[in-house]
Amino acid sequence: MEKKLLREGPYADFFSQGVQVGNVLTMAGQIAVDDNGNTPDDLKSQMIMCYENILKILDHFGGTLENVIDETWFVTDIDECMENVSEIFAEREKIYGCKPEVSQTLIGVNALVQPNLKIEIKCIAHIEK
């Protein structure tokens, strides 16, 4: 089995940001931390930054958001997410450029890797070789 890997960032020695086998690309969960280590305070801004990181991975493997087939969102405050779901999903549609045609799972968690994080997004994409 041939694997194509993307290892970068501060944890490159520990895991890959993306792994492609055949036409399937799995991505590590993406968090809202920029290249300088900064994280926005609010959920919507963190979601936007997660997608910015997802776009970088997709681009590395020759894909776009059109290739995403599945998303899993991990959020630390499910109530906050659901109270703002219309605004958050409207912003998500802007990022995708359309209503996303993906399966999606939303999971509430007690914590993420850093205490100020509110969301982590993990995606699977199908990219033709």
Task: Name every feature range the model reports, one short phrase each.
Residues 1-69, 75-129:
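N-terminal presequence-like segments and the immediate start of the first folded domain
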